[in-house]
Regions:
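Conserved class I S-adenosyl-L-methionine
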Residues: 1-38
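Class I SAM-dependent methyltransferase SAM/SAH-binding core
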Residues: 45, 51-100
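Short conserved loop adjoining the S-adenosyl-L-methionine
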Residues: 100-107
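A conserved beta-strand element that flanks and buttresses the S-adenosyl-L-methionine
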Residues: 114
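Short catalytic micro-motifs in class I SAM-dependent methyltransferases
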Residues: 117-118
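A short glycine-rich, Lys/Arg-flanked "PGG" loop and its adjoining helix->strand segment in the class I
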Residues: 128-140
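C-terminal alpha-helical "lid/dimerization" subdomain adjacent to the S-adenosyl-L-methionine
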Residues: 147-204
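Core SAM-dependent methyltransferase catalytic element
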Residues: 204-226
Length: 226
């Protein structure tokens, strides 16, 4: 069954188990918070903020940070509003689809942007537009952090990825290539390969690199020159 992000029950269940089956995410988030300590204070865009878990971590770890959280799920945003209420004017939450960011009013000199497990729902054209919009809303030397699912590039490589996912305790872990493709389709996931994401970042004007890649999970970073 496809993920129903508009269903309050599904949103609550996801919020309760957001790192289950993804052992790389906790370490990537820890690394994100460490790097953000060196980032200038100011607005941080949270693309696909969901239930506000990442925003809360950032606000707790960086006193000068303000978060503009964007998400298309009203159910997720309701959880985020409750979670982030105590932070008052440091948080602004907006219901917005990542496929139509040009409709969003956002600061144009943000110090950073983060996208955690959100961009893999976009096709390549939509992904390119989201990256370019993000670039345009960052201050010179602003950072873009992407923590997300990555495409497994070819069927003949799948068994190696399957074994790694099994060792890491990732779930679900389809046994074969056809099962993997079916799982992606059912969930509406369209992950891009590392090289594809880096290409989109460079096209937009970012200096970029894959900071940490573990099979089909990775942390990629881009920085606007300035």
């Amino acid at each position: 069954m496809a993920k129903n992000w508009q269903d309050p029950a599904f949103a609550e269940a996801w919020d309760a188990r957001h790192v289950v089956g993804n052992p790389a995410r906790a370490e990537h988030l820890s690394l994100l918070l460490t790097i953000l300590e060196e980032v200038a204070s100011g607005w941080i865009l949270d693309l696909g903020c969901g239930s506000g878990l990442i925003a809360q971590m950032v606000l707790d770890g960086k006193a000068g940070a303000r978060i503009l959280g964007l998400d298309s799920s009203a159910a997720m945003l309701e959880i985020a509003k409750e979670r982030l209420g105590p932070y008052d004017e440091r948080v602004q939450l907006t219901e917005a689809d990542l496929t139509s960011l040009d409709r969003v009013k956002a600061p144009t000199e943000c110090s950073a942007a983060i996208a955690v497990q959100s961009l893999h729902h976009l096709d390549e054209t939509q992904y390119r537009a989201a990256v370019r919009w993000t670039f345009e809303h960052l201050a010179p030397r602003g950072w873009f952090f992407i923590i997300d699912r990555l495409a497994i590039p070819a069927e003949r490589l799948y068994s190696a990825f399957h074994n790694l996912r099994e060792r890491q305790g990732q779930s679900p872990n389809p046994a074969d290539w056809s099962g993997y493709l079916e799982w992606l389709e059912v969930n509406g996931d369209r992950p891009l390969p590392v090289q594809g994401i880096l290409r989109l970042l460079e096209e937009a004007g970012f200096q970029s690199t894959a900071l940490d890649v573990r099979g089909d999970r990775g942390m990629l970073i881009g920085r606007r020159p300035g």
